[in-house]
């Protein structure tokens, strides 16, 4: 039994039979449920105690969204305060009584999701193996059946059969469940799809939903990718796991306000996985590690309602003497990871960003080529057209490749630097299936004219901007100013970033030149052909 004198060391909220953690801090994507006070104090308690947690770092009351008639999945595991001295058998159960206790204690009125639509894998039984602190993940299957627009809850409690004690204040975990309508689908399928990577350290992905096609009002972007979560070595376990910084964590924590609005418009939302300066990476995972990492990715997709993942094999520090669970870098290992992802996530998008050829999956696994396993791949050197590059990857057709990625931030003058409309035409004519954009800065640039230059070629249509934009942490839009033809007329004060002076002789021949720094001058823009030119 739990001795009362240790309660102050545990520092958990005591609420009936429910582990209440609505005040927990969501600080990262790793399994990172923060209990008030240091969790290290749990190890000072006599005996071994356990508690129920969600995978993917999800705080309690994280909403799982069901789209139309599609099922959803929660991912739970059991964690001990100390390594188990023997195998600990854990039994999870769907617990309506625990939800009622939570409602009474917290003055809430959550309705239990229809129990006949819920089930636990393997009858709810799972094991914490001797010498370990955590069980594997247990899937909570949530079939469609609730009323759209209603917020439900599902409480899952746990008991153990020897080896550990589950105290009454940490035996239950609660997910919210939100049935939503089916995604809208674009009426006419596109031969060339658009993908936009958004640097969420600075920008809000909601901005991507403010650009629409003039003819039918559908979104300009097909896929938006959250850039980026990381693959890192877990210092406690030595395995590869997902790590998210505060900005990515904020976005996932607020998926209902940031991800769902884009999906409601028909835009798919992916999360990019990026290497992060240690030996873990897409190209170094062993077969078992790839299986394990794919399962973790699935937990993120299921819990946060992601449509898929993009993989960017930059910044990993691959080792020539890899640790257990890792191998020397190879495209074959990368292909194995994509195979494991495809096996357990057949309906999710899997995309690849590459710029070195060897930083991408290649070859085949179990008879499936890299080109068959991925949904698309793109060339990552910006403003350069890599026609024919797809031939380097096994089984990859042009329809799955994006050879012309455009960086559209300040570095490239909003995308105009290095942009060539004729290249877009050639991309389309050659049969390529993807046009990629990277790092939009919509609070700095008005992109409707730029995107129109692309869409006129690809879709014979123009792109309109709603005039609204979002700051990084905004859930509601700010009204901006839409520039029209007349907006540019008049006199403008301009400042150059630099200036070049060329000195000529009396015969008008250039003799020498010199940089002369920033200069200020006035420019007057006048109407030429009304509404069309200046």
What spans do the regions from the language model cover?
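C-terminal motif of bacterial Sec signal peptides marking the signal peptidase cleavage site
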Residues: 24-28
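Hydrophobic alpha-helical transmembrane signal-anchor segments
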Residues: 14-22
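Secreted glycan hydrolases and related glycan-binding modules that recognize and/or cleave
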Residues: 30-89, 93-117, 121-123, 127-534
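Bacterial N-terminal signal peptides that target proteins for export
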Residues: 3-15
């Amino acid at each position: 039994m739990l001795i009362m004198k240790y309660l102050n060391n545990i520092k958990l909220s005591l609420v009936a039979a429910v582990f209440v953690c609505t005040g927990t801090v969501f600080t990262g994507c790793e399994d990172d449920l923060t209990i008030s006070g240091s969790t290290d104090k749990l190890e000072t308690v006599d005996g071994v105690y356990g508690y129920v947690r969600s995978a993917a770092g999800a705080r309690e009351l994280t909403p799982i969204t069901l789209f139309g008639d599609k099922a959803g999945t929660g991912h739970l595991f059991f964690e001990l305060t100390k390594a188990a001295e023997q195998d600990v058998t854990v039994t999870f159960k769907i617990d309506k009584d625990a939800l009622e206790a939570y409602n009474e204690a917290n003055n809430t009125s959550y309705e239990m999701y229809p129990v006949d639509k819920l089930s636990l894998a393997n009858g709810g039984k799972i094991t914490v193996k001797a010498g370990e602190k955590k069980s594997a993940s247990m899937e909570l299957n949530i079939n469609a059946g609730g009323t759209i627009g209603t917020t439900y809850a599902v409480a899952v409690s746990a008991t153990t059969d020897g080896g550990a004690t589950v105290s009454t204040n940490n035996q239950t975990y609660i997910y919210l469940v939100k049935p939503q309508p089916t995604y809208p689908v674009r009426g006419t399928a596109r031969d060339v799809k658009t993908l936009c990577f958004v640097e969420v350290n600075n920008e809000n992905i909601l901005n991507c939903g403010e650009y629409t096609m003039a003819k039918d009002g559908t979104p300009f972007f097909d896929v938006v990718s959250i850039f980026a979560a990381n693959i890192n070595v877990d210092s406690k376990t030595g395995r590869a796991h997902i790590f998210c910084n505060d900005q990515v964590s904020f976005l996932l924590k607020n998926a209902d306000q940031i991800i769902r609005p884009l999906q409601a418009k028909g835009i798919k939302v992916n999360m990019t996985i990026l290497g992060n300066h240690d030996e873990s990476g897409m190209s170094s995972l062993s077969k078992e590690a790839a299986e394990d990492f794919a399962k973790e990715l699935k937990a993120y997709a299921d819990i946060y309602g992601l449509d898929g993942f993009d993989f960017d094999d930059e910044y990993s520090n691959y080792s020539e003497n890899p640790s257990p669970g890792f191998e020397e870098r190879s495209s074959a290992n990368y292909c194995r990871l994509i195979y494991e992802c495809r096996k357990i996530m057949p309906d999710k998008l899997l995309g690849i960003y590459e710029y070195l050829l060897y930083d991408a999956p290649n070859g085949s696994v179990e008879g499936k080529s890299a080109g068959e396993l991925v949904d698309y791949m793109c060339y990552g050197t910006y403003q350069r057209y890599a026609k024919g590059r797809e031939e380097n990857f096994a089984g990859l057709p042009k329809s799955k490749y994006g050879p012309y990625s455009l960086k559209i931030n300040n570095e490239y003058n909003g995308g105009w630097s290095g942009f060539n409309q004729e290249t877009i035409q050639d991309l389309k004519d050659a049969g390529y299936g993807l046009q990629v954009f990277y790092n939009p800065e919509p609070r700095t640039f008005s992109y409707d004219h730029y995107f129109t230059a692309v869409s006129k070629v690809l879709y014979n249509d123009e792109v309109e901007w709603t005039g609204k934009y979002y700051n990084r942490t905004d859930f509601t839009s700010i009204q901006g100013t839409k520039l029209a033809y007349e907006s540019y007329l008049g006199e403008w004060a301009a400042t150059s970033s630099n200036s070049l002076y060329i000195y000529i002789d009396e015969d008008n021949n250039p003799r020498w030149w010199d940089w002369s720094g920033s200069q200020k001058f006035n420019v007057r823009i006048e109407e030429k052909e009304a509404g069309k030119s200046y």
